[in-house]
Amino acid sequence: MEKRGRGVKSSPIQTPNQTPQQAPVTPRKERRPSMFEKEAYTQILRERLRESIHNVQYVEPPFDDSIADIGKEWKSALAKLKFANSYRMEPLKKFQAHSVETKVQQILTESLKDVKYDDKVFSHLSLELADRILLAVKEFGYHRYKFIIKVLFIQKTGQAINIASRWIWDIAWDSWVAAKHEAESYVALVLVFALYYE
């Protein structure tokens, strides 16, 4: 007779002539290799790419460098270059506002010849003009100067406009240039600021 109750497992009654029934043996699953094991790295890559059209041809062997060595390599690669101080407090060539103004005015009139006002076109044209003017000003060879170029397009609708700029700078070396092009439907204004950078 079987005992049944709470917490007691029932087992089949065995007679002396019967052999005990064994539970079906389930095959043990193989342990998945860790990606941190050197030998298993290529196997993991192959498993991941098995269903794709790529085949793993070659895998670089894992490096044996310690983490501390990697950090040292990165620090040296990211270090800033240090240059010797020249102790020069003024530019070799002072900014010549008149020659730059002539060049900027020439670029402005050439670029805007026969152009009608269109706000969508002018948004891209202002960027192109600023780039062209910046390249032209850099060709003058003013070393240690940083340039800021502002290109403004104003549609003529019978309004009055006042454009003002304020700055704090060194009056001995810093300067600015303005060039204007007026058409039937708009006014174009270019401001070039040259700031000496020691």
UniProtKB/Swiss-Prot annotation:
Keywords: Cytoplasm, Cytoskeleton, Dynein, Membrane, Microtubule, Motor protein, Transport. Residues 1-34 are annotated as: Disordered. Signal peptide: none annotated. GO terms for cellular component: cytoplasm; cytoplasmic dynein complex; membrane; microtubule. It is a peripheral membrane protein. The keyword Transport applies. One of its GO terms (biological process) is microtubule-based movement. Expressed predominantly in testis. Also expressed in brain, lung and trachea. Residues 11-24 have a biased composition (Polar residues). GO terms for molecular function: dynein intermediate chain binding. It is found in: Cytoplasm, Cytoskeleton; Cytoplasmic granule; Membrane. Pfam families: Tctex-1 (PF03645). May be an accessory component of axonemal dynein and cytoplasmic dynein 1. Candidate for involvement in male sterility. Belongs to the dynein light chain Tctex-type family. Interacts with CCDC159. Interacts with CSNK2B. This is Dynein light chain Tctex-type protein 2. It comes from Homo sapiens (Human).
